[in-house]
Amino acid sequence: MSEFLNTHNASILLSAVNKSHYPQDDLPEIALAGRSNVGKSSFINTLLGRKNLARTSSKPGKTQSLNFYNIDDKLRFVDVPGYGYAKVSKKERAKWGKMIEEYLTSRENLRAVVSLVDFRHDPSSDDVQMYDFLKYYEIPVILVATKADKVPRGKWNKQESAIKKKLDFDSNDAFIIFSSVDRTGLDTSWDAILESL
């Protein structure tokens, strides 16, 4: 990984709410999607070896735009607003939905979506909907189950099976068990991302 990419050379590039704001070049992009508070910011920070590049928040639903991160001028991460947060108005949610859909279905730079689910729980209906959406549009998916440090190792197989069953998981997709606390799944995540470029 390090031969190709200096992952520490990363910065937030811009925030976009529609197509006209997207970067106008052909760098490959990996989008990151998941429920509010699934640990998306922690995932980004862990992958990039940074503490606060992606701001973590105790207030879910904080990211309201597409945040583009430049990684070593070779790749971009695109942080998609967290879904499934009840305290946001229906109108606001519909607006986010449209923005996310527009990006995911029409962005030529997009190579894959890292879809994050909470390893402690079965996927929510929003998680299932997101996975179905990505499969419908034939967008490559890397499924990352976060917060693995909070699940006893003896229950990992059972929990992985439950998540896969609920999602009707495609065995061709990568399934990665991840923890930003002990960095479980860090190298596997990078391998899957670089493979999709």
UniProtKB/Swiss-Prot annotation:
It comes from the Bacteria. PROSITE patterns: G_ENGB. GO terms for molecular function: GTP binding; metal ion binding. GO terms for cellular component: cytosol. Belongs to the TRAFAC class TrmE-Era-EngA-EngB-Septin-like GTPase superfamily. EngB GTPase family. Necessary for normal cell division and for the maintenance of normal septation. CDD domains: YihA_EngB. GO terms for biological process: division septum assembly. Coiled coil: none annotated. Residues 26-197 form the EngB-type G domain. Its cofactor is Mg(2+). The gene is engB. Transmembrane segments: none annotated. PANTHER family: ENGB-TYPE G DOMAIN-CONTAINING PROTEIN (PTHR11649:SF13), MSS1/TRME-RELATED GTP-BINDING PROTEIN (PTHR11649). GTP binds at residues 34-41, 61-65, 79-82, 146-149, 178-180. This is Probable GTP-binding protein EngB.
